[in-house]
Structures are given as structure tokens and as C-alpha cells.
A protein has these predicted regions:
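Cysteine-poor, low-complexity segments in flexible/peripheral regions
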Residues: 81-342
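Primary detection of the long, small/polar-rich alpha-helical "axial" segments characteristic
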Residues: 1-118, 164-165, 317-426
Length: 426
């Protein structure tokens, strides 16, 4: 009980510090970086609570790692016991595993482009009028609408819209699919217009922008190995990340790989190639698995991994053994509402267990005192009994001695009478 209470005292100290930090975070003058620093310490404090819970033990018994009842024998007979009800106390059971005071960043991603300017190449175009028109024709002057190329991420295709042709060449105005080389050169290979016009999902990029860098085979393999379809992996884009906080400050977020609405954290290697950040762990079956690090969490930029439908901080899941170790706390998906109320509830939970343990310690003290009194009383009773027995035996011994002495005296006298008679006869 004392060992457990000592551990709970340290947990209480950590919770008090977490509450102080939560009070600080409620101040609107904090910048986003201030909140990040506060959250970092809160996370460390909660990790320490989990460590204390998992490692505190008495005689090999972990006293806070799980709900348990310890039975202590306090008497000499069966049933003379006192039970200690122990509870699992960690960030999860306290309801603080997803405590987060950060504010969400405004996340922006921009496709990584290869170097070089872009030019419109019509060398392979077999329509003389259109080819001449794009370069400057007689029947009006053709131009790429708004001077932009459009990209449709859904189908991973590029388009331009030709306008300005007149008279007999007016029918050539419309939307055409084009290809974009790594150096940014836009090639118009066909004369067949796109049915239905510009796709609704296409977004404009300036004509002079180079083509986004294509994902390498290695990166696509990482995506497909994680369960993403080959079709979706083929549509993925390498992007640069930036985050804008509530005060309008923008910070660089490095590289990422965008697949649909999801963005995975990526790293540029020394050889210039890119790879998605991964986390290795051991699943519930004891198998080593690898998960892709996705950008998310309450702030929108924390690296998280999804394992068995649950989302964890990548830093916590790294190397974790889900078969042999306790379940991890899930990553916070949003800023915690009423954090002080949650912390106060956690403190009340710890205080309740400490009160129970204090009461048990008082019971132990009472049992020890009672046993001491019993021992003293029994010792005194035994002493009195032994004194009485001794007195009885002494009395019996005295009686026996008296009888023995009396018998000896009578026998001596009896022997003396015949001697006297014989003396007279002589």
C-alpha cells in the first residue's frame, strides 16, 4: 500500500504540472510555437505517468499496471485477511491519452516541379490550320486561354484551351489534352478536342511552370505495400508542405507525398531521391510490420500511423510490441475541449485511490495494534497460568517432602523400640 501510494504521489505531481501547462495554454497571447512547446511537455508528463504506472512494483507484483486485488493475511486462521483493491492508473484510464492544447495549422501543399521553363511544342501536330493558328494564323490569332495549362489530378492529365481562331478555323477553338515533359515543355500531339470541355476537377497552372516531379517506383511500391491501390498510387504527387499558424506565421513543413486527401511525410535522400517516412512495429500476432507516416494529429502536421483502424503518434508506435506490451494511447485528432475539467477529473480519480490506500494502511495499523494487544494479553495469561501451575507444584512438592520426612521419623522411632527391649534383656 505504501509503495503504491508513493507512486500515486508522483503521478499526482505530474498531473498538477499538466494542469499548470493547460492553464498557460488557455492564454490567447500564446503563439502557435508556444502551444507546441507546452504540448511537448504535456506529452512528456503523460509518458512519465505511463512509465510509473507500468514499472512500479512490490515484490515483483506491478501495482498500477492493471486492476488487481491483493489479499494480505493478518491473522492465524483462514479468512483473517485484508484485501487491497488496486486500479490501473495511466493516461488512458485517466482520460488524458488524447489531451491536446495545440491549435490546428493551416496546411498547404504545393506540387514539386522539375526545373526548366515551358514552351508549347506543336511539331507533331498534323492539323496545319491549328498548328499555324497556335503559332499565329491568318484567320484570327490563336492563344492558350489565360496563358495557362490545366492539370486534372483525378486522371493525372494536362489540358489547354485554344481560343481566338475565327472564320473557317473557329471550329478549332476548344479544349485539347497535352503532355508536359520534365523540362516543362507542353506538347500538343492531337487535334481531337476533349468532349465536354475542360474537366471540372482540373486546376490551372501557369504555362511556364514545369511538370510536377513524378513519383519514383520505390515510392509507389511503398504506397501499394501499405494497401493503397496501384491506380491511386499512380496519381500520387510529391509536394512541399507549409503551415500557417493562427498569427499568420508560415513555417516550412518539408516534403510529402499526396494521395487523394491524405499526405504522407517524405524525406529527400542524399542521392536526390525521395522516400516516405515509415514506422516499424510488432503487431498482435508477433509479426514485424511497417506503417507509412501520415501528416495529421490535432495540429495537422504531426506524423501519425494507422494500425488496426486506430491512429497513433508515429514516435510512440515506433518499435512498440502490440502483442507483449499494453495498448498505446491513440493520437489526439483535435484540440481537447475543457482540458482543465478533464485534468481535474483525473486528479479526483487519483485522489480516490490514494484515499482507499490510506484507509487500508490505517486498517493495517489497527490490525497490527490489535495483534500486539492479543499477543500481550495471551503472554500475560500464559504467565499467570504458569505461575499458578508452579505454585501448585511447589505445594505438592512441599507436602511430599513433609510426608517423606514424617515417614522417616516414624520409621526411625519404630526401629528404636526393639533396640530398647533388647537392651533390657541383656
Amino acid at each position: 500500500a505504501q509503495t503504491t501510494e508513493g507512486a500515486l504521489n508522483e503521478i499526482n505531481n505530474n498531473l498538477q504540472r499538466v494542469r499548470e501547462l493547460a492553464v498557460q495554454s488557455a492564454n490567447s497571447t500564446n503563439s502557435q510555437s508556444d502551444l507546441d512547446s507546452i504540448q511537448a511537455e504535456i506529452t512528456q508528463r503523460l509518458n512519465e505517468i505511463d512509465r510509473v504506472s507500468g514499472q512500479t512494483q512490490f515484490n515483483g507484483v506491478k501495482v498500477l499496471a492493471q486492476d488487481n486485488t491483493l489479499t494480505i493475511q493478518v491473522g492465524a486462521n483462514d479468512g483473517e485477511t485484508i484485501d487491497i483493491d488496486l486500479k490501473q492508473i495511466n493516461s488512458q484510464t485517466l482520460g488524458l491519452d488524447s489531451l491536446n492544447v495545440q491549435k490546428k495549422y493551416d496546411v498547404k501543399s504545393e506540387a514539386v516541379k522539375s526545373g526548366g521553363g515551358a514552351t508549347l511544342n506543336t511539331a507533331g501536330l498534323n492539323d496545319t490550320a491549328l498548328k499555324a493558328g497556335v503559332g499565329g494564323a491568318t484567320n484570327g490569332t490563336a492563344a492558350i486561354k489565360d496563358g495557362k495549362v490545366f492539370f486534372d489530378a483525378t486522371d493525372n492529365k494536362y489540358f489547354i484551351e485554344v481560343e481566338g481562331l475565327t472564320a473557317g478555323d473557329a471550329t478549332k477553338n476548344g479544349v485539347y489534352e497535352v503532355s508536359v515533359a520534365d523540362d516543362g515543355t507542353v506538347t500538343m500531339p492531337a487535334t481531337t478536342k476533349v468532349a465536354g470541355g475542360m474537366p471540372a476537377t482540373a486546376t490551372a497552372v501557369t504555362e511556364t511552370q514545369p511538370k510536377p516531379v513524378a513519383l519514383s517506383t520505390a515510392v509507389k511500391d511503398q504506397l501499394t505495400d501499405s494497401g493503397i491501390s496501384a491506380a491511386d498510387a499512380a496519381k500520387g504527387q510529391l509536394v512541399t508542405m507549409s503551415y500557417t499558424d493562427k498569427n499568420g506565421k508560415t513555417i516550412d513543413g518539408g516534403f510529402g507525398v499526396k494521395v487523394g486527401a491524405n499526405i504522407y511525410a517524405a524525406t529527400k535522400n542524399k542521392d536526390g531521391s525521395f522516400s516516405i517516412n515509415t514506422t516499424e512495429y510488432t503487431d498482435k500476432g508477433g509479426n514485424t510490420k511497417t506503417a507509412l507516416n501520415q501528416l495529421g494529429g490535432a495540429d495537422g502536421k504531426t506524423e501519425v500511423v494507422t494500425i488496426d483502424g486506430k491512429t497513433y503518434n508515429a514516435s510512440k508506435a515506433a518499435g512498440h510490441n502490440f502483442k507483449a506490451q499494453p495498448e498505446l494511447a491513440e493520437a489526439a485528432a483535435k484540440t481537447t475541449e475543457n482540458p482543465l475539467q478533464k485534468i481535474d477529473a483525473a486528479l479526483a480519480q487519483v485522489d480516490a485511490l490514494r484515499s482507499d490506500l490510506g484507509a487500508v494502511q490505517n486498517r493495517f495499523n489497527s490490525a497490527i495494534t490489535n495483534l500486539g494487544n492479543t499477543v500481550n494479553n495471551l503472554s500475560e495469561a500464559r504467565s499467570r497460568i504458569e505461575d499458578s501451575d508452579y505454585a501448585t507444584e511447589v505445594s505438592n512438592m512441599s507436602r511430599a517432602q513433609i510426608l517423606q520426612q514424617a515417614g522417616t521419623s516414624v520409621l526411625a522411632q519404630a526401629n528404636q523400640v526393639p533396640q530398647n527391649v533388647l537392651s533390657l534383656l541383656r
